[in-house]
């Protein structure tokens, strides 16, 4: 500070809690095939930001598989799609490799790997990942889950779309909390082909996730929500209310989401393929991911600040306000936030490390409401009272 000064001095006091913003929960990362040509402006392995069906058609052409996947998404939801179209190949093994992708000598990422550039290119980090039909191949499904771990996303994986037994066998290849398997596929009317066609379910489910996020919140389950635009499923899935031996329940018991016909076609299933029961519900995984990323992105301002009592107080109050907002929205039930007195030792503080604990209870889906109905003669004599 300077010495004597005759006049008014104004100083910015840069303290106080900061607000924490929620990241978008429903940006979709999509990889599928197309053919380069006059009807497509995109080049193979270009990363494209898509916000409408019209943009998808312009980029990939009207008949491309990736365009059909975009249509499936937009049939239900207004969504931002980070899309990477790969060349359509005749060799199945080469096609699988193209979908999985890699990093080229010049540093360009291809296939699924290109989705990692969504945030740096478009400030759009995918939270829902799909490689329609291709994810029914284990190599692609595994790569999709690995990518989901990096992005804190959900990998929506297609089942084999053949039999229940095949779907259950395929599910046993995974044990990840970010893997969400759906089987069978869907059927819909394709205006380009003027016919009913079969399609993998993952793009349709991604659209349903995005719609649920918009209508109910990222903490809500897409299960028991109706699809728009489909006319059937790849195979009929038996569903009977109250019957725990029906085929839909058999698939759900194997942690496979399925599609039932019950007042429309509905997604039916809340569970991931996690081998850890703590992460069984997809809603818990997504809530944790969003909370963690919001805290991560919301505290860049706190890095390299001087560790003072005011600093600890400001961070704590900001976290409390953020969690309080989530509670008021219904995203969580309750929470606690505090600077950890045991971890914040003089040695740790001297190294520039400060620890906060954020604990919360998420909102589970009512997967199994139970109603106990009893018939009794308790009020039978009331007929006599009424007659008196």
List each language-model region with its residue ranges:
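Surface-exposed assembly/interface segments
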Residues: 1-388
């Amino acid at each position: 500070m300077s010495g004597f000064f005759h006049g008014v001095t104004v100083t910015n006091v840069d303290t106080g809690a900061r607000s924490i913003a929620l990241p978008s929960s429903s940006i979709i990362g999509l990889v599928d095939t197309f053919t380069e040509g006059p009807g497509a402006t995109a080049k193979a392995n270009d990363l494209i930001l898509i916000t409408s069906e019209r943009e998808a058609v312009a980029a990939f052409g009207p008949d491309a598989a990736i365009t059909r996947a975009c249509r499936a998404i937009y049939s239900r939801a207004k969504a931002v799609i980070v899309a990477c179209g790969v060349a359509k190949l005749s060799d199945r093994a080469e096609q699988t490799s193209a979908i999985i992708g890699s990093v080229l000598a010049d540093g360009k990422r291809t296939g699924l790997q290109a989705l990692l550039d969504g945030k740096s290119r478009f400030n759009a980090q995918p939270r829902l990942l799909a490689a329609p039909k291709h994810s029914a191949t284990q190599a692609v499904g595994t790569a999709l889950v690995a990518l989901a771990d990096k992005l804190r996303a959900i990998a929506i994986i297609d089942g084999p779309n053949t039999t229940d037994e095949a779907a259950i066998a395929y599910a046993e290849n995974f044990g990840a909390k970010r893997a969400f398997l759906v089987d069978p596929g869907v059927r819909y009317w394709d205006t380009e082909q003027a016919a009913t066609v079969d399609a993998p379910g993952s793009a349709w489910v991604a659209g349903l996730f995005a719609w649920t996020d918009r209508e109910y919140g990222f903490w809500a389950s897409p299960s028991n929500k109706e699809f728009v635009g489909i006319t059937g499923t790849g195979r009929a899935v038996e569903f009977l209310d109250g019957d725990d031996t029906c085929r839909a329940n058999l698939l759900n018991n194997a942690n496979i989401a399925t599609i039932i016909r019950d007042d429309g076609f509905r997604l039916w299933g809340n569970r991931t393929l996690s081998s850890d029961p703590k992460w069984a519900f997809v809603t818990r995984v997504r809530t944790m991911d969003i909370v963690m990323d919001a805290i991560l992105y919301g505290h860049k301002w706190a890095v390299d600040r001087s560790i003072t009592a005011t600093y600890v107080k400001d961070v704590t109050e900001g976290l409390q306000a953020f969690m309080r907002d989530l509670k008021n929205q219904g995203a969580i039930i309750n929470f606690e936030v505090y600077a950890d007195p045991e971890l914040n030792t003089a040695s740790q503080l001297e190294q520039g490390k400060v620890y906060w604990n954020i604990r919360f209870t998420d909102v589970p889906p009512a997967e199994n409401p139970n109603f106990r109905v009893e018939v009794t003669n308790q009020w039978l004599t009331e007929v006599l009272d009424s007659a008196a």
